[in-house]
């Protein structure tokens, strides 16, 4: 049989082959344009079926965002020492393969065990407004001087929740993750 062609088969086998043709898209950000798949059956004796078109519509799936290189970090803290960044390796990376920004998303930092809600604080280090820097002004969080979100909580046992906007790119949120602080 020629490339892309099956050898002659009985009718029942041909039906089974047709029922098992599958379509898939490789990659995380496929085009959502419709595709047309054309099926033609020949009998090996010169007979050819009519063209049978099927339209395939690809519906994108929202892949989850990721934070890598943060798990396993360990922070040795002396009581009363002031705010210290939690991300000790300075190599955490935030990514989202199918979104250019985290508009309306949130970044939440919370204690999962052993917290003293009367004394433990989660916050955001204010580096400034320069290139690559995270800043804090009131409840606003900035990256390179542009607002990327607002925050609430972080004290009295409340989670630190940063609500992000369209300016919160993966690069900006990576910088933010690297500037979450702990203080007692």
For the regions a language model picked out, list residue spans one by one.
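Extracellular glycosylation-rich, acidic/polar low-complexity regions of adhesion-
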Residues: 1-184
């Amino acid at each position: 049989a020629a490339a892309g062609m099956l050898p002659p088969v009985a009718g029942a086998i041909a039906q089974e082959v047709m029922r098992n043709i599958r379509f898939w898209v490789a990659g995380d950000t496929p085009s959502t344009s419709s595709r047309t798949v054309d099926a033609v059956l020949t009998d090996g004796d010169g007979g050819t079926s009519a063209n049978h078109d099927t339209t395939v519509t690809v519906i994108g799936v929202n892949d989850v965002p990721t934070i890598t290189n943060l798990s396993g970090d360990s922070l040795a803290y002396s009581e009363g020492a002031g705010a210290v960044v939690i991300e000790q390796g300075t190599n955490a990376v935030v990514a989202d393969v199918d979104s250019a920004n985290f508009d309306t998303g949130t970044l939440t930092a919370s204690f999962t065990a052993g917290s003293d809600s009367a004394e433990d604080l989660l916050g955001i280090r204010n580096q400034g407004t320069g290139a690559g820097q995270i800043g804090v002004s009131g409840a606003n969080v900035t990256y390179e001087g542009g607002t990327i979100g607002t925050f609430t909580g972080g004290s009295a046992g409340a989670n630190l929740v940063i609500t992000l906007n369209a300016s919160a790119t993966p690069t900006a949120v990576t910088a933010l993750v690297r500037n979450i602080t702990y203080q007692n």
